[in-house]
Amino acid sequence: MMRVVHLIWSLSTGGVETMLVDIINEQVKHALVSLIVMNDSVDSELIRNLDKKCNVLCCSRKAGTKNPLPLIKLNYWLFKIKPDIIHVHGGGLGKVSLYPSPKVFTIHNAHSAPSEYKKYKALYAISKAVQEYTRGQGFESVVVENGIRVKDIRVKEDNSASETMQIVQIGRLYHPHKGQHILIEAMNILVNEMKEKIISVDFIGEGSSYKYLVGLVCKYHLEEHVRFLGGHTRKFIYDNLCNYDLLIQPSISEGFGLTVAEAMVAGVPVLVSNVPGTMEVIGQGKYGKYFETDNPRSLANSILQIKTDGCNRKRLKEARDYAISNFDISHTAQTYLAEYKRILNKS
């Protein structure tokens, strides 16, 4: 069987890390898979979710340290495993892994630095938007779209309007990229200017912007309308996403948008900023609504329009079918395995 090593800096809760676990759990059915985590940031829940057939190795490096021991560990394990392919998921890792197997790299966002791209046998973009960005940097890449565990997501059974419009935003609380402040600003317009009182937002996630975002909520006196639920397991999200009336992804920068695809599978309407990554997920507007990026009033008007118009059941079913057909994790994992074989056949 093919021996594959996935190499990543950390395994904390996030879109990249969570999806990597899902990919590995599919790939172990067809290959001998190892995961090497460089830093000491490891989420126990993600480790528990990994298939036992995956060989997990942690270098326990402290972020920022110059201690060479973790690098020695990394290369000791690589020479012991003798992988056929090394799949890298973080900038800088390719140049410190010395084993002479072909290395490939997944570009997860539209602000990756291309300084080490030449070291890889292949580059993979998670969306056409990221592929275009990478092409603009002078490098070609193959699109392998992100995937989700579609069978695990509970589906919304009743799309009738609830008394209070319940909105959810899921993701790392880092507003310069994820744009949560735009949603809070839009809530200020809706609640305090437009007097739309029967509306609420739940933020699910953790991150460095938490205090800033809480401060904005207090500034606009939105405490009765906005909640921060903290980080939650994937099971919690997949079980509860269907209870919401709308998912909003207000990103200022986004390579793909996993939570948007998850909401589509759950039968929940989606509203996204018109950045290329999220627009790609909703079929350029065919399977969801969008608003002008970094524009709270555009977002507020879009929310109000959705609240007024209600749900289009036919469109929601089409969106769900589209997401299931295009974003199933099994397809993502199989595509990568096929790519590995292609590269090995060329070597």
Q: Which residues does each PLM region occupy?
A:
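N-terminal strand-loop element at the rim of the active site
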Residues: H6-L69, G207-Y210, N274
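A conserved mid-protein helix/loop that constitutes part of the nucleotide-sugar donor-binding site
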Residues: G14-D22, M165, Y174-N192, S208-V214
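Short alpha-helical donor nucleotide-sugar binding micro-motif in glycosyltransferases
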Residues: L78, G231-H232, D239-Y244
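Carbohydrate-associated surface elements
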Residues: A129, G147
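Nucleotide-activated donor-binding/catalytic signature segment of Leloir-type glycosyltransferases, i.e.
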Residues: V214-H232
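Aromatic "clamp/platform" in nucleotide-sugar-dependent glycosyltransferases that forms part
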Residues: I252
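Short hydrophobic beta-strand element within catalytic cores of glycosyltransferases
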Residues: P269-V272
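Conserved acidic donor-binding segment of nucleotide-sugar-dependent glycosyltransferases
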Residues: Q284-P296, Q305-G310
